[in-house]
Amino acid sequence: MSRDDVSIAVVGGGIGGLAAAVSMLRAGVDVHVFEQAPALVEVGAGIQISPNASRLLHRWGLRAALDRTGVRPVAVHQRRWDDGRTLQRAPLGEAAEAAFGAPYYHFHRGDLLEALADALPPERLHLGHRLAGFTDHGDRVELRFANGATVSADVLVGADGIHSTVRGELFGPEKPRFTGCIAYRGLVPADRLGHLELEVLANNWMGPGGHFVHYFVAGGRLVNFVAINERETWTRESWTDRGEVADALAAFKGWHPQVGAIIGAVDETFIWALFDRAPLDHWSVGRVTLLGDACHAMLPFMAQGAAQSIENGATLTACLVRRGGADVASALRRYEALRLPRATRLQEMSRANKTRFHLPDGPAQQERDALLATRGDRSIAALGWLYSHDASVIDGNHAHP
């Protein structure tokens, strides 16, 4: 059975959809990506890619592209909100690569998206294709697009985000859950912050009702920040709503001066309400399955949303190569069985970190800080189950290149 005997239509040209397509093409699978936007334009924000995802991207031939724009932090610092005290320093950099076999990166999201898109032949990526509906005929899936185009494929992969049309068609309408958090995000030219003498770190400042993350991206030219603050209610879901710098500064009044200095140096900030969805019991129906935020939208508090989407693509490719076009439904069930428990675990851990990061000063916070201090170097080693994972391995063997 050849690898090109099954045709795949991926709906959604974000990081997860493009990564899946790159993985499939490397394995000789016939795949096309359909993206509703007329151009691939990623929001101005940072993204963390841990070794469990970077090993896959390297294997797919992207290492040189990633090294051009990616920043490799030497450590992650957990810090106290008011006095800046480092509660824990966990090594990354060379130590993480030696331990897990692949590096930990920080990227501008646009740089990562561009690297993935450049790895696809232009004829495999179809822009301006908004999915209007689909029909699973049993032996194939027919896709209908708002521009009037129709496409037939053996498998439909819905990688179309938290507002997934494919998920809605499979399982009915469902509103995402507001998590009680909003985030101000921004990118600051690094030369504006030279007086702070920032190290090349992943920084997480934890305080009452919020936390503040910052790190270098774009080859060190920019500092990305995300300032998370708790709110009781919110209705809009958007990555692109403009925020007020003054509001972000007010939300973090009383925090360490470095926090205010980073926020205050930004030209513009965007406000992002954090929504997620309850974990699904299954992702696949017939010849249709889901990938990424479409099936496991999670808070960014484990820095695993994109990484898990990339893992999805590797595992789905491996399952399709193993089973081939003759047994698509079985391949999708295998993919789901391998991926759903891990993604659900990380959804739940990400939600738990909201409470852990936002503790008010008091006994629970003191217990958390004491525990962080005792772990040190061991905190990263404890994540071996996460960072050492190779999502392309099925039954102990690599199922594709």
Locations of the language-model features?
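C-terminal helical "tail/cap" subdomain of flavin- and related membrane-associated enzymes
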Residues: M1-V6, R68, A261, M302-A303, ...
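Conserved N-terminal helical subregion
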Residues: S2-I8, S50-P189, E232-A246, L372, ...
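Conserved mid-domain beta->alpha element of the FAD-binding
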Residues: A9-P38, V157-G158, Y184, H214, ...
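Conserved N-terminal glycine-rich FAD pyrophosphate-binding loop of Rossmann-like flavoproteins
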Residues: A39-R55
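Short helix-loop capping/hinge motifs at secondary-structure junctions, enriched
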Residues: A64, A190-E197, R323
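Active-site substrate-recognition segment that forms the wall
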Residues: R79, V200-T235, V245, L249-K253, ...
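A short coil-to-beta-strand element that immediately follows conserved catalytic motifs
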Residues: F178-G180, E197-L201, V245, P257-A273
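Amphipathic alpha-helix from the class-I
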Residues: I228-R236, P257, A318-A326
